[in-house]
Every structure is written in structure tokens, then in C-alpha cells.
Amino acid sequence: ENPDESVTEGDLKNANNGDEYYQGRVLRKNGYEYGTPTGRARRCGWFDAVAGRYSITINGLDAIIITKLDVLTGLKKIKVCIGYTHNGQSIKDFTNDIKILSECKPVYEEFDGWEEEIRNVKSYHGLPKNAQNYLRRLGEILSVPIYIASVGAERDETIILDERFG
């Protein structure tokens, strides 16, 4: 399998290539990340909070939904891209300058993973502590609350984190 093969083109700052190529394959396998019409493998990477904050801002979002939390089950460590470096300079905000973006390296915050199966979990407090910590910190990094988290592929494998949606 070619680590550069992808269903879509474009710059993925946190694609798990090189030293993290194996990790990207695990995420792809666990998340069934293959193109529907072609069956080609999609590139997978850690959550990019820089791009996430930018998306939240330009779309005027006041809350988000996290999907595929179950894909992270079994990983010893989980990373979130919290910034970039470019020519030794720290970048905290997303840039739409394609040249600069293509030269950036991700800066990660690392979390402990969890081993417990979460697909049957129905509440935030039923999640493993490390999964709770991950969701809590994502909300802090993104500066918006997470209202819903999916813990599996089925409709009922969803946790409502905000009572307004319960």
C-alpha cells in the first residue's frame, strides 16, 4: 500500500505518513476509511484543531459534534494538532496561504488512550476517564462545547452531551 495514495488531493498537515504511517493505517482500518466508489484508502491523520477552530469561526458555529470516537479505542496515545511551525516560528491560527501551509509542521498535544470498548456507552460519565479527558480538552482547545459524540457506526451509538438535545 502506498502511503501517498489518497482518495482526495490536498494538504493534510497531520497525515500519518513516515514514522506514523503505521498509525494512519490503524486509524483507517478502525474507521473503515475507504472511498465508496473506488475502495481506495483515504489518508488519515490526527484531529487538526487549528483547522477545526478556523472552520468553527468561518461557519459561525457555537457547538460541535464529534464522530468516530470509537475509532480511537485501543490506541495507547492519541494526538491533537494544536499548532504548526513554519521556519522555526510558531503558528497558532490557520493560514490560507497555500505555500506557507504546505511548509508547516504540526505541533501535537498528546493524550493517553483507552482500551475499554465504548460502543454501548450511553452517557459521558460511562466513558473511560481518558475518553472523557479527550472530549473535555477538545472542547477547550476549540473554544466551543461538544454537544454530541458518536461512539459507533449505528444511530443508537451516540452520546448526548448537552441536555438540550436529549
Locations of regions flagged by a protein language model:
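Non-transmembrane, aqueous-exposed alpha-helical and coiled segments at domain scale
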Residues: E1-G166
